A protein has these predicted regions:
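Bacterial Sec-dependent N-terminal signal peptides
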Residues: 1-27
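Short loop/turn motifs that connect adjacent beta-strands in outer-membrane beta-barrel proteins
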Residues: 18-23, 64, 101-114, 150-153, ...
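Gram-negative (and chloroplast) outer-membrane scaffold detector with strong preference
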Residues: 59, 63-133, 189-199
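Transmembrane beta-barrel strands of outer-membrane/channel proteins
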Residues: 26-32, 69-73, 117-123, 144-146, ...
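Predominantly the C-terminal beta-signal and adjacent terminal strand-loop region
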Residues: 71, 76-81, 86, 150-209
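Residues that define the transmembrane beta-barrel architecture of outer-membrane proteins
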Residues: 22-24, 47-53, 87-91, 111-113, ...
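Short glycine/proline- and aromatic-enriched beta-strand/turn motifs that initiate or cap beta-hairpins
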Residues: 17-58, 66, 196-200
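Outer-membrane beta-barrel translocator domains and adjoining extracellular loop/strand segments
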Residues: 38-43, 78-84, 108, 127-136, ...
């Protein structure tokens, strides 16, 4: 009985302690997007550009684990062909792990730098620029996010993410991959710079304490 009581008090104390910190944040980022495959020969460099926008909301269940919902827009547009290209709109959910806490980065850097990792799934609508055909794609995303704390209410972040697209029927230039409509696994990556806004009634956020 005493063991159960001690366990209950320990869990209750942890929950109360965590409730002293904000857990929710809003994230806005923009940056570079580049296709890896598939694309027609000679097109790859033309479709890499600063046409990436990411808007998300994150909730941390604890100081290390959380979940993130996001909307992402990537525009793969040719600099040489006005009719070629695709527009990717992705809606996703990811698990977030604060690896910076394990590395004690917040302590070593005097609460200035942090490091998050994330992985999850998404639903992507790829619109072909020339024909306006929509390709519906399932996506898997993995990434790493260094953070720099501005103050208790905001932080800058640099995100590196790789996106794997399952059942992709069209190349990034907008051409059909197979006349038999056989899909492939596509891949592109994003490098973005953004800002985190910490939301809540408390002064501090779980990211840093």
């Amino acid at each position: 009985m005493n063991k159960y009581l001690c366990f209950f008090l320990l869990v209750s104390g942890t929950i109360i302690a965590q409730s002293n910190y904000n857990k929710f944040s809003l994230e806005f980022a923009s940056g570079y997007t580049s296709p890896v495959r598939p694309y027609l020969s000679g097109y790859n460099s033309n479709f890499s550009s600063f046409n990436h926008v990411n808007i998300g909301g994150r909730y941390m269940f604890s100081e290390k684990f959380g979940v993130r919902l996001e909307y992402v827009n990537d525009r793969f547009i040719s600099s040489n062909d006005a009719t070629a290209g695709t527009y990717f709109n992705r809606f996703g959910a990811q698990l977030v792990y604060n690896v910076g806490k394990d590395l004690d980065l917040w302590y070593i850097t005097n609460e200035s730098f942090g490091l998050l990792t994330h992985a999850g799934v998404g639903y992507t609508r790829s619109t072909i620029k020339k024909s306006q055909v929509v390709d519906q794609i399932g996506s898997v995303v993995i990434g790493i996010t260094p953070q720099y704390k501005i103050n208790d209410r905001s932080a800058l972040f640099l995100d590196f993410s790789s996106v794997f697209n399952f059942k992709q029927h069209y190349r990034y230039d907008g051409s059909l991959i197979s006349s038999d409509y056989v899909p492939v696994v596509g891949n592109h990556y994003n490098i973005s710079l953004g800002i985190i806004l910490y939301v809540g009634e408390n002064r501090l956020h779980n990211d840093w304490y």
